[in-house]
């Protein structure tokens, strides 16, 4: 099932009109769209109905190749809410990027100890995302050397999982407020990754996430913290420069640390937000977790967009 939603201007998540198009979503070139467009789709994948939004920006040209960002909502969130507060609509419009917002199973992703029914039922979310990428690539003009993953909280853990288990697909990853919750995959080859984390995050603590795993998983598996996660990725990417991350930029409200001399020309970065909590998206009307309004989404995009396969 496909619903075509026309995005009103300014591009802030408002939806002005819905069409009644209903076509087979497995056939390429399925619709002649008016841009910008927000397309709401569902199809059966592995016996389950899976849904997503696709933002096709004003600058989309089927004769050119466009980057793709897979943008994953957090636990108990959904694709529509995340479209409205993640600000990747701005990135899409300013850079002619296609952004897809998948919907997690029961509003969750299977990404390690966090979180919800997707984890409990062993949902193959990596498989779902890879099939979704194949579908989008068949229907739109995608630069397959510039596919990126992003997300928030449980969606950030899923972003890490995709970077770890599908490093042959993704050129880079960048997300907010969670870590890699699995061991390095045998198939992993280094790609670049940036994580953004608020020092005042009470849901996924900056220092270590034991309280989070105890709450969400009734376990003490949450040994990960923001700096340790950065160090772990540095080791996975065989980064040079010693065990302690280098501080590259430092301001009153945030800093950027990590490694910039790693295998395959990759980098691993951590953005520490001194006054932010769990949802540090800019100009956020849903949450007030980024009080100094650091443009975290732009930081993530500028980092990811440097890299291609």
Regions found by a protein language model. Name each.
Residues 14, 20-68, 80, 94, ...:
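A domain-start/cap signature at the N-terminus of enzymes
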């Amino acid at each position: 099932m496909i619903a075509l939603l026309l995005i009103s201007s300014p591009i802030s998540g408002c939806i002005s009109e819905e069409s009644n198009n209903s076509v087979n979503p497995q056939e390429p070139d399925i619709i002649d769209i008016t841009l910008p467009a927000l397309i709401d789709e569902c199809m059966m994948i592995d016996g389950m109905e899976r849904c997503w939004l696709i933002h096709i920006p004003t600058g989309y040209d089927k004769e050119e190749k466009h980057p793709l960002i897979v943008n994953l909502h957090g636990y108990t969130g959904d694709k529509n809410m995340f479209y409205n507060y993640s600000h990747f609509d701005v990135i899409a419009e300013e850079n002619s990027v296609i952004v897809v917002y998948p919907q997690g199973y029961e509003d969750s992703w299977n990404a390690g100890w966090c979180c919800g029914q997707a984890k409990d039922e062993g949902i193959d979310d990596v498989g779902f995302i890879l099939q979704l990428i194949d579908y989008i690539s068949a229907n739109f003009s995608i630069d397959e050397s510039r596919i990126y993953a992003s997300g928030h909280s449980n969606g950030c853990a899923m972003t890490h999982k995709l970077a770890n288990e599908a490093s042959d697909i993704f050129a880079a990853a960048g997300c907010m407020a969670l870590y890699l919750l699995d061991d390095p995959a045998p198939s992993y080859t280094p790609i670049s990754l940036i994580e953004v984390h608020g020092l005042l995050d009470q849901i996924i603590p900056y220092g270590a996430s034991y309280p989070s795993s105890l709450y969400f998983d009734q376990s003490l598996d949450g040994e990960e913290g923001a700096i340790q996660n950065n160090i772990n990725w540095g080791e996975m990417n065989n980064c040079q420069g010693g065990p302690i991350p280098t501080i590259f930029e430092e301001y009153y409200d945030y800093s950027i640390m990590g490694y910039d001399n790693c295998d395959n020309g990759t980098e691993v970065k951590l953005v520490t937000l001194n006054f932010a909590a769990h949802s540090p998206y800019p100009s956020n009307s849903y949450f007030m977790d980024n009080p100094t309004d650091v443009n975290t989404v732009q930081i993530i995009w500028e980092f990811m967009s440097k890299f291609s396969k």
